[in-house]
């Protein structure tokens, strides 16, 4: 079963962190990312660009309307994603728990949401 992992952060909390705290936090991420990759189950792993460069596309009167910024009502914003191919739900949870946002970053509002995928099309 394939699972989409969404890595969330809270921009206000993250912005309140000192540069040294951010650097210390981020410096721990590569080792955890590598631990996930070493399972051989990670198909995709990505961090997302600056929120100021996000665009939202919506259908409006038969045309596609583009607006600035993320479309979200939440204080938490998706900052990264991953897709894993797990043999079971338990394995999916175990692998997702290795992600930095599941183990670090409480002060930045980090969290992971793990979602079973019904459809997956790869190149």
Regions found by a protein language model. Give the residues of each.
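Conserved, structured core segments of small domains
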Residues: 1-123
């Amino acid at each position: 079963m394939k699972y989409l992992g969404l890595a969330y952060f809270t921009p206000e909390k993250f912005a309140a962190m000192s540069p040294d705290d951010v650097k210390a936090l981020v410096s721990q991420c590569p080792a955890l990312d590598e631990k996930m990759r070493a399972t051989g189950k990670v198909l995709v792993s990505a961090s997302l660009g600056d929120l100021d460069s996000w665009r939202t596309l919506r259908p409006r009167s038969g045309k596609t309307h583009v607006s600035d910024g993320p479309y979200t009502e939440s204080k938490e914003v998706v900052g990264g994603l991953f897709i894993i191919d797990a043999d079971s739900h338990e394995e999916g949870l175990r692998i997702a728990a290795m992600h930095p946002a599941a183990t670090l970053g409480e002060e930045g509002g980090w969290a992971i949401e793990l979602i079973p995928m019904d459809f997956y099309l790869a190149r």
